[in-house]
Amino acid sequence: MQIADQSKRVVYLGTGRRKSAVARVRLIPGSGQLWINGRNGADYLQNNPIYLNLVKAPLETLGLENSYDIYVNATGGGLTGQADAIRLGIARALCQLDIENRKPLKTEGYLTRDPRAKERRKYGLRKARKAPQYSKR
């Protein structure tokens, strides 16, 4: 979705989900800063290059690394789930920016929501699929 904020700048919105993590992303024309939950993105992701590269991958695919400031509100899950959710949210926001961005992002797999989530525990079992030890006698 595309909206205008108080200073009349255009804001592009995208929502990403992964496992139990949800990330609401705002892209604002700027210098390429990343803010997650009010903190610097590198600090929030513990300066882990894997997470940082994961989050910035959609922008690098389109060559827009230093064109937009990214503001993220991420809740739930752990760092891996949140990083994947942020990547999906950024990719969806970039599709709002220009419909031509959709094809390269889809080719790289950045617009695909990973459906894997924790399976619920069933009664009579110790975990989702682990059964108590069987004793024949």
From Swiss-Prot:
Residues 106-137 are annotated as: Disordered. PROSITE patterns: RIBOSOMAL_S9 (PS00360). Residues 106-117 have a biased composition (Basic and acidic residues). GO terms for cellular component: cytosolic small ribosomal subunit. The keyword Ribosomal protein applies. GO terms for biological process: translation. Belongs to the universal ribosomal protein uS9 family. NCBIfam families: PRK00132.1. This is Small ribosomal subunit protein uS9. It comes from Thermosynechococcus vestitus (strain NIES-2133 / IAM M-273 / BP-1).
